Amino acid sequence: MSFNHKTIEELHDLLVAKEISATELTQKTLEDIKSREEAVGSFITVSEEAALKQAAAIDAKGIDADNLMSGIPLAVKDNISTKGILTTAASKMLYNYEPIFDATSVANAYAKDMIVIGKTNMDEFAMGGSTETSYFKKTKNAWDHTKVPGGSSGGSATAVASGQVRLSLGSDTGGSIRQPAAFNGVVGLKPTYGTVSRYGLIAFGSSLDQIGPFAPTVKENAQLLNVIASSDVKDATSAPVRIADYTSKIGRDIKGMKIALPKEYLGEGIDPEIKETVLAAAKQFEALGATVEEVSLPHSKYGVAVYYIIASSEASSNLQRFDGIRYGFRADDAKNLDEIYVNTRSQGFGDEVKRRIMLGTFSLSSGYYDAYFKKAGQVRTLIIQDFDKVFADYDLILGPTTPTVAFGLDTLNHDPVAMYLADLLTIPVNLAGLPGISIPAGFVDGLPVGLQLIGPKYAEETIYQAAAAFEAVTDYHKQQPIIFGGDK
């Protein structure tokens, strides 16, 4: 018997009633991972021994009836530090790295007696939109194994979508939770910048990175955010604002809610069938009592260019620490210190990572800083101001998560610009530090379409309220790929 169709609340009831044990649930989860892993390739590391040991300890002390997550397995993206469990960032550079500490998000999960079942595949150092730049393997879409799962958190998305696990953690720098959530038909949230501690997250773009949850449903997503969100003295960017319960507005109606639909989000480059799906969703929100009106975010068209200058510049600084001296991969053909640095970084980093390091180094270099990095920061401010103007009059922004459904494996990985444009609709949210969610909203050619809801800072409860209202009157979240037992 598999438990992957049961919600977290249903699993909790079974655990409390002792109809199953944490060990049995962990064993079944490990079986689900193994039976599906060859097809989708979600995991880099499955921590079977550690997970079973932790489950046994939880069983020994007993399930806490007041702790919803007690004994629940969790998959963690492989750029989030896990003490004693390989944390590679999907890079040759860290192929053998075992952290000596847990990320705060992981420590928070452990504090709630969640069981880390394994580490999921991703684009190397979270740089990519297809999970094809991983040093270890290419993850495949849960709905069609000839398509990409999205990225960079592709493994975390497919692990949930394929029924390997119920919950997972990812990170989002320019869309890396929302895009794979959309491509795989699951719920993925990028919280407000600072809501979840970045301590223990292997840094890519420090002003953009944010850890967030994946789940099959809106409520389960919010329940996981309840676990990982916290202020943290170990993270200087951690926000002091903490919502007591992110599920508090789920189930409330949305009558009177004002939702903005930016015309730029339905313009050039957006697949016509995606546009139709979003417009149908807008009508559904109106039927639920919300007002949906067209607005403009005029500077969003510069988002991709701004992002790749800022993110690459921050990455070029953050990745300087990987030099072959202290930990990780070291080139064995070096004859002196300079060659250790050069050869290690040349051999240890993949092409996409090296491309972004070079772009960032150029943008920060003397003579080009003002023309690129400084100007990108100024345009970033304009993008933030666009959002501020809209949120002065509206509660949420609605739009597609991605311009297309999942594209084929090996179709865009040799065309960086085309790959970058796939994040056209998600990047502005990171630049502004806002919360955004992707929820299932339909299908095009048998592939899931994601609907994005964006809120002002710290409006996660309102986002969850609207997302849950839409979910309650649609069945897209209930449809599952064949690998999960569905009929698609």
Swiss-Prot record:
GO function term, MF aspect, one: glutaminyl-tRNA synthase (glutamine-hydrolyzing) activity
Domain of life: Bacteria
First-level EC class: ligase
Keyword list, A-Z: ATP-binding, Ligase, Nucleotide-binding, Protein biosynthesis
Gene Ontology annotations for the cellular component aspect, listed alphabetically: glutamyl-tRNA(Gln) amidotransferase complex
Reaction equation(s) it catalyzes: L-glutamyl-tRNA(Gln) + L-glutamine + ATP + H2O = L-glutaminyl-tRNA(Gln) + L-glutamate + ADP + phosphate + H(+)
Active site: 77, 152, 176
Gene3D superfamilies, sorted: Amidase signature (AS) domain
GO biological process: translation
Enzyme Commission designation: 6.3.5.7
Similarity annotation: Belongs to the amidase family. GatA subfamily.
Protein name, entry field: Glutamyl-tRNA(Gln) amidotransferase subunit A
Source organism (scientific name): Streptococcus pyogenes serotype M18 (strain MGAS8232)
